[in-house]
Amino acid sequence: MATGSTSKAKADESTSKITPLGTALKPLNSEYGKVAPGWGTTPVMGLFMALFAVFLLIILEIYNSSLILDDVGVSWYSLGK
């Protein structure tokens, strides 16, 4: 029968290989599912997101030449000098 399973397939699924990397990373997974009470590090994440948004806006303004920088060339030709 094509839908039947063999004992060999079940044996392969039940035995798992323990690797040194898995053993080293196991302590990092011990806190899985636990949530710290309160806001935790959310304000810090918000601060870094705001700083990253400001960084992206500055890069966009430089690219669009909206932000004029004296003595800074924004063409490929000036980069080759």
Swiss-Prot record:
Keywords: Chloroplast, Membrane, Phosphoprotein, Photosynthesis, Photosystem II, Plastid, Thylakoid, Transmembrane, Transmembrane helix. Its main location: plastid. One of its GO terms (biological process) is photosynthesis. Phosphorylation is a light-dependent reaction catalyzed by a membrane-bound kinase; phosphorylation occurs on Thr residue(s) in the N-terminus of the protein. One of its GO terms (molecular function) is phosphate ion binding. It is a single-pass membrane protein. GO terms for cellular component: chloroplast thylakoid membrane; photosystem II. It is found in: Plastid, Chloroplast thylakoid membrane. The modification Phosphothreonine is found at T3. The chain crosses the membrane at residues 43-63. The keyword Membrane applies. The keyword Chloroplast applies. InterPro entries: PSII_PsbH, PSII_PsbH_sf. One of the components of the core complex of photosystem II (PSII), required for its stability and/or assembly. PSII is a light-driven water:plastoquinone oxidoreductase that uses light energy to abstract electrons from H(2)O, generating O(2) and a proton gradient subsequently used for ATP formation. It consists of a core antenna complex that captures photons, and an electron transfer chain that converts photonic excitation into a charge separation. PANTHER family: PHOTOSYSTEM II REACTION CENTER PROTEIN H. Belongs to the PsbH family. HAMAP family: PSII_PsbH. PSII is composed of 1 copy each of membrane proteins PsbA, PsbB, PsbC, PsbD, PsbE, PsbF, PsbH, PsbI, PsbJ, PsbK, PsbL, PsbM, PsbT, PsbX, PsbY, PsbZ, Psb30/Ycf12, at least 3 peripheral proteins of the oxygen-evolving complex and a large number of cofactors. It forms dimeric complexes. This is Photosystem II reaction center protein H. It comes from Nephroselmis olivacea. The gene is psbH.
